[in-house]
């Protein structure tokens, strides 16, 4: 049997932290992608080609991680709603 010791509000606060983390990761990737363009304009050769290939290979994984954090946010919000509704349902049964 599972046990959740967090209140719905605490779960919502945690969910928001995941959204904040996702946005931070997206912001960093945007800045680094812009910087990559600057480097691209000023560095020619096979060394840069390898550098750019590595960056381009990893960028989608970073984007996927940011999306995963958003997905976790949504899951936590749903859990908070379920906990809140379950508590309300139990309370209404006791008060009958």
UniProtKB/Swiss-Prot annotation:
SUPFAM superfamilies hit by this protein: EsxAB dimer-like
Annotated transmembrane regions: none
Recorded superkingdom: Bacteria
InterPro entries according to UniProt: ESAT-6-like_sf, T7SS_ESAT-6-like
Pfam families: WXG100 (PF06013)
Family affiliation: Belongs to the WXG100 family. sagEsxA-like subfamily.
Quaternary structure (record): Homodimer.
NCBIfam families referenced in this protein's UniProt entry, alphabetically: WXG100_ESAT6
Name of the protein in its database record: ESAT-6-like protein SAG0230
Species of provenance: Streptococcus agalactiae serotype V (strain ATCC BAA-611 / 2603 V/R)
């Amino acid at each position: 049997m599972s046990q959740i010791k967090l209140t719905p509000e605490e779960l919502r606060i945690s969910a928001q932290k995941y959204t904040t983390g996702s946005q931070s990761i997206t912001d960093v990737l945007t800045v680094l992608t812009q910087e990559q363009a600057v480097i691209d304009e000023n560095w020619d050769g096979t060394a840069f080609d390898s550098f750019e290939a590595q960056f381009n290979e990893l960028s989608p994984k970073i984007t996927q991680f940011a999306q995963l954090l958003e997905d976790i946010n949504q899951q936590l919000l749903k859990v908070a709603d379920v906990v809140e509704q379950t508590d309300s349902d139990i309370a209404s049964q006791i008060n009958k």
